[in-house]
Amino acid sequence: MEMARISQIAAALACCALALPAAAQSSRVEKTQAEIALEQAKTTFATQKKARDDANAACAARDYEACVKAGDSYRKGMGGMQDYALALKAYDRACTGQNGKGCASLAYLNMLGRGTDKNLAEARRLYKQSCDYGEVSGCAGYGNMVYTGTGGPKNVTEGTNKLRDACERDYKWACDRLVDLGAFDPNDSAFERLKDYR
């Protein structure tokens, strides 16, 4: 009888143990895809806001690479509202600190007229300054503007050379642009005959 009672108790405990996970599952609330997406967006925004705040603080302390990051966050609207005026200020501070990326980003906004009046001559000057600081994207932008005569005199040879240099530094846009423009090798004699034709 004692053995039967132990068996009954063991069976009752086993039933209770099995019932607990089933009860816990039935009371668990699943999240919808929208709720999951909202949580992820809030987390991403908080991370981006902190990155923007950190970049602004470092920019104020004359970390010019951080100024570029702050400018990017304002231009793209990451970590807060999109604000081209603040992006321009951050990029200008970076460019003034001789950061080539800052000058190239400032040139891009001037070229498009975002946060400022469209000014192609200023964009060209800033792309050249960026290139002079060693920024490959600035060299590509400057080369493109010189090749096409945008914002200043056209010079196919100089433009081709700048684009080719940027392409050789693995800047894909410059390589694609050379193909799009049908740019010839400036050292090729056929190029000399055709350079004024374009």
Regions found by a protein language model. Name each.
Residues V29-E30, D165, R169-R198:
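Terminal, low-structured helical/coil segments at or just beyond the last alpha-helical repeat
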